[in-house]
From Swiss-Prot:
Domain KH-like: 354-439
Name of the protein: GTPase Der
Record-level Gene Ontology MF annotations: ATP hydrolysis activity; GTP binding; ribosome binding
Classification of source organism: Bacteria, Bacillati, Cyanobacteriota, Cyanophyceae, Synechococcales
Keyword annotations of the record: GTP-binding, Nucleotide-binding, Repeat, Ribosome biogenesis
Entry annotated with the keyword Repeat: yes
Quaternary structure and partners: Associates with the 50S ribosomal subunit.
Gene that encodes the chain: der
Residue numbers binding GTP 1: 10-17, 57-61, 120-123
Keyword Repeat appears in the UniProt entry: yes
CDD domains: EngA1, EngA2
Known role: GTPase that plays an essential role in the late steps of ribosome biogenesis.
UniProt: GTP 2 binding residues: 184-191, 231-235, 296-299
Family: Belongs to the TRAFAC class TrmE-Era-EngA-EngB-Septin-like GTPase superfamily. EngA (Der) GTPase family.
Length: 455
């Protein structure tokens, strides 16, 4: 059984995201003075005592307004309550009971999820009890005065949360999930792709750019293994983003790339590869992440039997630094090839984590040298490649011992990398090659030691 879920519910700007960050000991949830910063439901890992659980943060609930994303936010909150063991209902003790609080209480009475009432912004313990007493009128049980920003009262609240969680014995042991980040420019279909993958409305979809502000974590099982999918905020040029919630979401997106095992770079089939797509691809390669390139909106392209081949050639010419990444043409709208993403991503992760023995590496290098010798300078000095060994994975990294790294130009270095890929695979992952100068006698001695260790 998966870890139990605790849902955070409340109207806008009562401090839900601040409480999430407090419960999860992080700053993942975006906190900003502007109401409605959180729109989709986002997941983080929380713990208290000897229990681990998931905390799901939902958008601010408003029932007397159907403009913009408010109906979708209500739908996201209802979905969060369906999977939660308990809901924490957050209200603002300084403002007192509002009509919005009463509407939320009425909404919760129609749900099957039990609720605990937390009265936030009770910074003074003495005044907090008096402020909390007013909220008995909501009919949601005992109100617990807390200060999300300072942590006061949260221990007692969490003790009550644990009483609603299923027995720990039902959770079982679980394999660590693969972290998959869905990244791309605004409005290329990232959230639609996430919803198509999950088979439910996990993220709000809109033609308005910047709909997704947070990174949205989704846990599921595919290819017989657990995955954690992260739908990131659309990443634009920095100069086109004002300092505010969207800025923080983009910063969170770059962090999602850093903590991912594999990235799905979503390209709009109608737009082709833009300069911003190239920058994102460069970021993936720079961070050493496995990658699958997904060309979305394929259903909207007029095509014949040659279109896919021609378009792939055109796209790869502009994404030349991701020439090792598999490319998949999909439609989030129709679901075409969406399920194939996991098979390609799983293979990329496997290659990203792969290790190869020194003897096998040197067989490939020997073959490469037989086909093409290292370059010779005008002064008659020739590069010598003594041996190579894999020194790390995630991404696979190799140190190549040579007489002088300066004798190996970019052209020959690219040739060696291509030969390693042709001989050993590593589809879907970048490689890092380190060229290190060494005297021949020392290199031969070190090679013998390496081979003896691997026996």
């Amino acid at each position: 059984m998966a870890r139990p879920v605790v849902a955070i519910i409340g109207r806008p700007n009562v401090g839900k995201s601040t409480l999430v960050n407090r419960l999860c000991h992080s700053r993942e949830a975006i906190v900003h003075d502007e109401p409605g910063v959180t729109r989709d439901r986002t997941y983080q890992d929380g713990y208290w005592g000897d229990r681990d659980f998931k905390v799901v943060d939902t958008g601010g609930l408003v029932f007397d307004d159907d403009s913009e994303f408010l109906p979708e936010i209500r739908e996201q909150a209802a979905l969060a309550l369906e999977e939660a063991s308990v809901a924490l209902v957050i209200v603002d003790g300084q403002q007192g009971v509002t009509a919005s609080d009463e509407a939320i209480a009425e909404f919760l009475r129609g749900q099957r999820c039990p609720a605990l009432l937390a009265v936030n912004k009770c910074e003074s313990p003495e005044q907090g009890l008096a402020m909390a007493a007013e909220f008995w009128s909501l009919g949601l049980g005992e109100p617990y005065p807390i200060s999300a920003i300072h942590g006061a009262g949260t221990a007692e609240l969490l003790d009550q949360v644990l009483t609603y969680l299923p027995p720990k014995s039902e959770e079982g042991d679980s394999e660590e999930p693969i972290q998959l980040a869905i990244i791309g420019r605004p409005n290329v279909g990232k959230s639609s792709l996430l919803n198509a993958i999950c088979g439910e409305q996990r993220a709000i979809v809109s033609p308005i750019r910047g709909t997704t502000r947070d990174t949205i974590d989704t846990s599921l099982v595919r290819e017989n293994r657990p995955w954690r999918l992260v739908d990131t905020a659309g990443i634009r040029r920095r100069r086109s983003v004002n300092y505010g919630p969207e800025f923080f979401g983009i910063n969170r997106s770059f962090k999602a790339i850093e903590r991912s095992d594999v990235c799905v770079l979503v390209i709009d089939a109608l737009d082709g590869v833009t300069e911003q797509d190239q920058r994102l691809a460069g970021r993936i390669e720079e961070d050493g992440r496995a990658c699958v390139v997904v060309v979305n909106k394929w259903d909207a392209v007029e095509k014949d039997s040659h279109t896919m081949t021609a378009m792939e050639k055109e796209l790869r010419a502009k994404l030349y630094f991701l020439d090792w990444a598999p490319m998949l043409f999909t439609s989030a709208l129709t679901g075409q090839r969406v399920d194939s993403i996991f098979a390609l991503a799983a293979l990329a992760v496997e290659q990203h984590r792969r290790r190869v023995s020194t003897s096998v590496v040197n067989e490939v290098l020997k073959e490469a040298l037989s086909w093409r010798s290292p370059p010779t300078t005008r002064g008659g000095r020739q590069g010598r490649l003594y041996y190579g060994t894999q020194v790390a994975s995630r991404p696979p990294s190799f140190t190549l011992f040579v007489n002088d790294p300066k004798l190996f130009g970019d052209t020959y270095r690219r040739y060696v990398e291509r030969q390693i890929r042709e001989g050993l695979g590593f589809d879907g992952t970048p490689l890092k090659l380190f060229w290190r100068g060494k005297q021949q006698r020392d290199a031969e001695r070190d090679l013998a030691r390496q081979q003896n260790r691997q026996g």
